[in-house]
Amino acid sequence: MRSVTKYYLHGVVLFATGCAGNPDAKRLYDDLLSNYNKLVRPVLNVSDALTVRIKLKLSQLIDVNLKNQIMTTNLWVEQSWYDYKLSWEPREYGGVEMLHVPSDHIWRPDIVLYNNADGNFEVTLATKATLNYTGRVEWRPPAIYKSSCEIDVEYFPFDQQTCVMKFGSWTYDGFQVDLRHIDEVRGTNVVELGVDLSEFYTSVEWDILEVPAVRNEKFYTCCDEPYLDITFNITMRRKTLFYTVNLIIPCMGISFLTVLVFYLPSDSGEKVSLSISILLSLTVFFLLLAEIIPPTSLVVPLLGKFVLFTMILDTFSICVTVVVLNVHFRSPQTHTMSPWVRRVFIHVLPRLLVMRRPHYRLDPHRSRFAGLVTGAGETTLWDEGSPGVPAPPRPPPCAPPLAPCAACAPAEAPALCDALRRWHRCPELHKAIDGINYIADQTRKEEESTRVKEDWKYVAMVLDRPFLWIFTLAVVVGSAGIILQAPTLYDERAPIDVRLSEIAYTAAKPRPPPPR
């Protein structure tokens, strides 16, 4: 408690000593501002123009709102001019050459931001001004401006924006206040480095490329006098890592899923479901994009083109998938395969697409049974391919029995004669053979139907294969053609904010090792 009281008393003593020990500054302040009229422009003659110089020192690029087209900046507005009423002789005031006075007590140029979007048009914080014995007045007030900025979203998110800040006197014309840049060179109205970036905190979203300043003279319809302004152009290039990771890469991944629709087998029943799911995902991306960019109808942003291109591809893939599924599930009862379809999609295209169809094999037991039944229904019950054994014709059911061995000689086939005698005497066997013939006919029809269905499935598979390659090529070429349109991808200019900012240099400079 004693130490706090000691420091407090020490500060009071120093303050009192400073106030009492600087009578020259107090006397100078009283002499300068006792009869000073801050409402009158400080010129000797009314026709004289007062030169006011201005410069911006950018401290922070707070935000660039794309949707509302507003740039928010934190900067210092450096202004200087000569006021003949605020000059003095230092020898008469104890060698005092500089004096700090409240800016509210002196004349100030009404410099405002013409393209103000929100808030105050002029500086609201009235900081102190610095007076020099020569009459030079310097005033550096800080301010946070929200300026309107025309956003060009054509190449978003690989875009480059140029936002302007137009400063000028609201009341005085060019014949009364000659507005110029502090670093302006005689004979030119352009200053290449019009904004001071020495105290700039680098932005995590934008790189500063150029900051020129241009002096303009403009005539309005209301007045004959010119009105001067200094326009500061801030050219920025977006850092694309955030949007690349969160928008571009997911959208490209979804676009490549469109290709997999044609690789998915039709029997899975999920081809259309996958396409519609992709379409819904792209719709969500489109809604997110609409929340970011301004509602302009002049251009379509690059990311919007990419999402729209992918949506069109996915919609077309749904149409193709429906056609492929229609072909896949065809049957002999609904469609007949034309000869040219069989020739093109079964014999020609598979060779061109390097497709090999697996050989379709029926059940060997069913095939052997069908052949045996067919032979029995037409001739006899033995293998008709046996060499040396002719097949006798089948007599009508109501015909009288043949004489024994009338069809062949006993020496050639005695077993055949015995079989014929037994067969003609067994009517139940005729009914069994008729039933077997019916089953054989149904089996043949089923196998033929299966063969036709497999042919249609193969045609659908052949249809899927060229569209697989077509969509793969379309996605790769289309994505590259859209994304690579952005000129910032080929812009190799180094940002000047990192080079000129002393704060960024100090932060990037490695710390020395601690002493041992």
UniProtKB/Swiss-Prot annotation:
It is found in: Postsynaptic cell membrane; Cell membrane. Residues 22-243 are extracellular. InterPro entries: Neur_chan_lig-bd, Neur_chan_lig-bd_sf, Neur_channel, Neuro-gated_channel_TM_sf, Neuro_actylchol_rec, Neurotrans-gated_channel_TM, Neurotransmitter_ion_chnl_CS, Nicotinic_acetylcholine_rcpt. Disulfide bonds join C149-C163, C222-C223. Residues 327-465 are cytoplasmic. Residues 1-21 form the signal peptide. The keyword Cell membrane applies. GO terms for molecular function: acetylcholine-gated monoatomic cation-selective channel activity; transmembrane signaling receptor activity. Glycans are attached at N45, N132, N233. Keywords: Cell membrane, Disulfide bond, Glycoprotein, Ion channel, Ion transport, Ligand-gated ion channel, Membrane, Postsynaptic cell membrane, Receptor, Signal, Synapse, Transmembrane, Transmembrane helix, Transport. The chain crosses the membrane at residues 244-264, 274-294, 306-326, 466-486. Pfam families: Neur_chan_LBD, Neur_chan_memb. CDD domains: LGIC_ECD_nAChR_proto_alpha-like, LGIC_TM_nAChR. Its main location: membrane. The keyword Ubl conjugation does not apply. GO terms for cellular component: postsynaptic membrane. It is a multi-pass membrane protein. After binding acetylcholine, the AChR responds by an extensive change in conformation that affects all subunits and leads to opening of an ion-conducting channel across the plasma membrane. Belongs to the ligand-gated ion channel (TC 1.A.9) family. Acetylcholine receptor (TC 1.A.9.1) subfamily. This is Acetylcholine receptor subunit alpha-like. The gene is ARA1.
